[in-house]
Amino acid sequence: MKHPTCDENKQEIQPVKDRRFACPGLFRMPKANDGGICRIKLPLGKLQSTQMLGVADATTQFADGQIELTTRGNLQLRGVQKHNEAKLIDTLLSLGLGPLTPEGDDLRNVMVAPTAGIDKSMAIDTTLVGTKLLEMLQTTKEFFVLSPKFGFLINGAETTTVVDHIADIWLSSNDDGQKFNFGFASRPDYSTGCANAEGSIDAAYAVDFIKSCLECLVKIHEQFPTVSRMKHLRKLPQYSEFLQAIRNNFPFNIDKPVICFPEAIKKQSLIGSFSQYQNNMFYIGARPALGRLTAEQMRKTAAIVAKRHTDSAVRITHHQGIIVPDCEENEIETILNDLMKIGYAVHEHDAAANVFCCAGAPYCHSGLSNVQKDGQYLIDYFNKKTISPIHLTACAKACVATVPFAYTAVATDEGYYNLFQSDNASDSKFGKLLNENLSIIEVANYLDGKISRI
C-alpha cells in the first residue's frame, strides 16, 4: 500500500477536541524544552536494519542525534525543530515507517511479547493476531475517535511475556493456545492465573472480539465524548452495560476465564542468548544504557545485525532493549561481543540492564531533575555489582512505567529523590516509601546496603 506524503496527511488529518495534541506521533510532534517529539510506532516492535540506518540519518539531520527506545516497543526522536518536521515525516514515510492511513497512526499501539513467533515456550504465535489487528485498526474509520494512547496487549505464554504493562484491552493465551483470557484497563495478573480476566474467547476469533469491543465503546463515546479509553469507561456506571453489550455484539461464545499459570513467563529471557522455537536458531537480547542510542550506535547496531545469515527484523522490547532473532549458534558470541563494545548490556545482571529513566530535566517541561545524568551515576556505581530494577522518574507522572518497578526514585528537586519499594499492599502507585529527599549518592548507598535510614 502506498504511504501518504506529509502534505497529504496535513490535508486529511482532522483536529479533534481532546488532548491528543499532547501525545507524540509520526505527524504530531508536541513541543518539549528541547524541541518537538516524534514517536515512530513500529509494527509489533519490528525494525529492519535498513530502517535503522535511515532513522540514524534522520535523527542526525532533523533531530538531536539520539534515539529513545520506548516501553511500548517504539522509537522516539527528540529535539525536532519546526522547520524540520515535514522533512522528517517524509523521510520516515520513505523508510516504510508510516501507517496504512493517516489517522491510523494513532491506533498502532499493539504490543506483543518481543519473542512472539519465535519463543520456544509460546502457546500461540501472536504475531498473526497482532498483524491482523493492526490492519483492522488502521482501516476502520469509526475507531479514529479513540485516544492515541489507547493500547492493546497480546500475550502468548512466551518467556518474554509482557507482565508489567496496563493495557486498554489485553488478551492472554492459555497453556494450549486455544483460548485467550481478556481484560480491560488492567494487566493480566499471572500470580492468580489471570483470575482478574473478565472472561475468555476462542483464540481464532481474537480480532473479531476486539472489533466488537471497540464498536461498543464507540457507541458510548458518542454519548460521552470524554470516554476515549477503557480507563475512562471503568469509572462510569456504564461499564457494566458495556460488558453486556459485548456479549450481545460478539457472535461467538464468551466463557469464564481460564485459570492457568504459564511457567515460561517466570523466566523473562530478555538479556543474553536463548534457543528459539525454530530448530537450531537462537535469539540475542541486549539493552543500551538508559534505553537510548546515539545515531552512531544505531548505525553500528544495524551493521552488526546485518552480518547474520538472514535479514529478519530486530524487535524493540518493552524494557527498552532489542531482540536480534534468527541467529545461528556460531554467530552468537560475535554478536554479543560486538553489541557490548558499542555500549549494550548483554548480561541480565549488568547495571545498564536494570536502570530506567524518562527524559527528565532539562528536556521535559515537568522534569524536576536530570534523571539521565543520575541514572548513569547508578550504572557506573553498580558497574561490578548487582542492582535490582530501578526507575528514576523526574516527576510523579512516571511516563516510563505503568506499574511499579522493584524500586522507584521520584524526583523532588534537582538530584534529590523519594525512594519507594514495590509493595502490593501500599496505596501508593510506586509502593512503600523507604526514604525521602535522598541525593542520588544516598540512593546508591541505600540500594547497596550501606545505609538504612537517613
What are these regions (language model features)?
Residues 65-69, 143-147, 218-267, 310-318, ...:
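Flexible, glycine/charged-enriched surface loops at secondary-structure junctions
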Residues 260-287:
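Active-site cores of enzymes that catalyze phosphoryl transfer or operate on phosphate-rich substrates
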Residues 27-28, 171-173, 273-275:
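Short amphipathic beta-strand and strand-loop transition segments with alternating hydrophobic
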Residues 33-35, 188-193, 222-225, 278-282, ...:
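Short acidic (Asp/Glu) and glycine-rich catalytic loops that position anionic groups and cofactors
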Residues 15-31, 97-98, 267-270:
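Intrinsic, low-complexity N-terminal interaction/targeting segments
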Residues 132, 136, 216, 245, ...:
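Residues that form generic nucleotide/phosphate-binding pockets
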Residues 150-236, 408-454:
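Mobile "lid/hinge" segments at catalytic clefts and subdomain interfaces of large enzymes
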Residues 2-15, 35-180, 208, 286-412:
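Small-residue-enriched alpha-helical segments and adjacent helix-cap loops
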